[in-house]
Regions:
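Conserved N-terminal beta1-alpha1 strand-loop-helix module at the mouth
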Residues: 1-191
Length: 191
């Protein structure tokens, strides 16, 4: 986390999805969040959570933003009174704007790969499926690494990018050199 902040990350994701090797306990996440430097945000990531779980994280970890993957409704996502990103798993037969329309209260929309499991599997999606017309800031995720993120930024022109497995040395373990290379590629492409 410190390596990401030093390299220039704008936000640090804290995963609260038990099947993920990146999942954090609330206590560990609270400790990590307390070490995040000023001007770097924390984002709590959930997949189909119970409301009580989200409230616990909000109370104890105090993330700046929530990120919802899964089948959560717009009403569910908005009930916490905290800015949130709604994720959409992209595939050719999904009308992204139609899928995301109910989430007009979201701070932004995160576009991710449509794969069997959630999160950090290293597969990208066809960026040509991203609509040119947008009503919300877009975050691109899914299969990004230092090798392809510059292309994604140039093609999609997202508000932000989100990375996990693309900067890991092994599942759940971030590699500081890969993190720095990724952020450098993003900055070089975003001109």
């Amino acid at each position: 986390m410190q390596a990401a902040a030093r390299a220039g990350a704008d936000a640090i994701g804290l995963v609260f999805y038990p099947p993920s090797p990146r999942c954090l306990s609330v206590d560990w996440a609270r400790q990590l969040a307390s070490e995040v430097p000023p001007f770097v945000s924390t984002v709590a990531l959930f997949v189909n959570p119970a409301a009580a779980e989200v409230y616990t994280v909000l109370e104890r970890v105090r993330p700046a933003m929530l990120q919802f993957h899964g089948e959560d409704s717009a009403v569910f996502c908005a009930q916490f009174g905290v800015p949130y990103l709604k994720a959409c798993r992209v595939k050719p037969d999904v009308d992204l704007l139609e899928y995301l329309r109910p989430f007009s209260g979201a701070a932004g929309w995160l576009l991710d790969s449509h794969v069997e499991e959630y999160g950090g599997v290293g597969e990208s999606f066809d960026w040509s499926l991203v609509p040119a017309e947008r009503s919300h800031p877009l975050v691109v995720s899914g299969g990004l690494s230092s090798e392809n993120v510059a292309t994604a930024v140039r093609r999609v022109r997202p508000w932000a990018v989100d990375v996990s497995s693309g900067v890991e040395s092994s599942k759940g373990i971030k590699d500081p050199a890969k993190v720095a290379a990724f952020i450098s590629e993003v900055r070089n492409a975003d001109v």
